Amino acid sequence: MPRTARGIYHNLKESEYVVSNGDATFFFFSEMYQNKFLDGYQKHREEFNKKINRITDTPLNMDMLADITFYSNVEKRGFHAWLKGVNTTWQEIHVYALRTMTKPCTQNWSRIRKPKLVERRKSMV
């Protein structure tokens, strides 16, 4: 189903509103939600880390887990994500976040054009 007159997609898989950090890619129903995510993820990371540090002082990098949480708070109508060009489930992206906690930093998010199928296949190799 194409985009509505107000620029909203009814199917996340067709959406052109896409952000990526190089490994993970999130899809949004509208440009408003995409902008809300891009404008707020840094602040949410800080707040998320403060909450975790109140409970326990951890050397782990919780940024990706914070970003997934923020995405699910912002995009209320569904969840569609890719990991390295492959469709992924909510559980799989959380496992990925747990694996990246030992990396010293998490890449920032940026808008990207939705990759075509040929480009996705290249990134999977």
From Swiss-Prot:
A Pfam family assignment: Phi-29_GP4
GO molecular function: DNA-directed RNA polymerase activity; sigma factor activity
Entry-linked InterPro entries: Phi-29-like_sf, Phi-29_GP4
Any one of the GO CC terms: DNA-directed RNA polymerase complex
UniProt keyword terms in alphabetical order: Activator, DNA-directed RNA polymerase, Early protein, Nucleotidyltransferase, Sigma factor, Transcription, Transcription regulation, Transferase
DNA-binding stretch(es), residue numbering of this chain: 77-96
UniProt keyword Transcription present: yes
Family: Belongs to the podoviruses GP4 family.
The protein's role, per its UniProt record: This protein is believed to be a positive regulator of late transcription. It may function as a sigma-like component of the host RNA polymerase. Binds to a region of the A3 promoter located between nucleotides -50 and -100 relative to the transcription start site, that presents a sequence-directed curvature. Full induction of this curvature is needed for the transcription activation process.
Protein name per the record: Late genes activator
Biological source species: Bacillus phage Nf
Name of encoding gene: 4
